Amino acid sequence: MNKFIVFEGIDGCGKTTQAKLVAEKLNANFTFEPTDGKIGKSIREILAGSKCNKETLALLFAADRVEHVSKIEEDLKNAHVVSDRYVYSSIVYQMTQGIPKDFIYKINDYAKIPDLVVLLDVDLNEALKRMESREKEIFEKLEFQKKIKEGYYNLINSENGKFMPKYGFIVIDTTSKPIDQVFNEILNAIVDKIPDIIQ
């Protein structure tokens, strides 16, 4: 049976790079949130600086995820799926903005539960250096990223219900490590949790 694996973490932790490498190794379909659909593109415009009510943005993320889940379920019929961000990003980022957890859970009620979530950790200053070359999104400020990092740890230490992945969470620290070392650590951790994932 094909597996659904999600990569999470603060901006600049190396999620996208590692998610793509793992997807390639597993012959999986790589996907991401926000998606590149119409709603996802609207979200990216807002993150780049357009004005939007925080609850409206939360609803847009949830609407984008409805379409994403449909695609994920279709893709899982033929291959593993690896996603760069998923519902956990919404929970952590939106709770950090002061949106109630109950509201976030309710609007994401249909979200498919992943088999495994890989949380990549990184020193905040190193993350900022990695992001220097990018255009800054509204969420990429140091103090905010610090709260996001805390939010992820609070989530994985308390989530034992609705969005608990089948094989749980794994945490990998990427600080001061080369890409290939991080990749090997992630792959070993995934295989340890799901031994039959590599055929």
UniProtKB/Swiss-Prot annotation:
GO terms for biological process: dTDP biosynthetic process; dTTP biosynthetic process; dUDP biosynthetic process. Keywords: ATP-binding, Kinase, Nucleotide biosynthesis, Nucleotide-binding, Transferase. PROSITE patterns: THYMIDYLATE_KINASE (PS01331). It is an enzyme of class 2 (transferase). InterPro entries: P-loop_NTPase, Thymidylate_kin-like_dom, Thymidylate_kin_CS, Thymidylate_kinase. Its EC number is 2.7.4.9. The keyword Nucleotide-binding applies. ATP binds at residues 9-16. GO terms for cellular component: cytoplasm. The keyword Transmembrane helix does not apply. It catalyses: dTMP + ATP = dTDP + ADP. Pfam families: Thymidylate_kin. GO terms for molecular function: ATP binding; dTMP kinase activity. Belongs to the thymidylate kinase family. This is Probable thymidylate kinase.
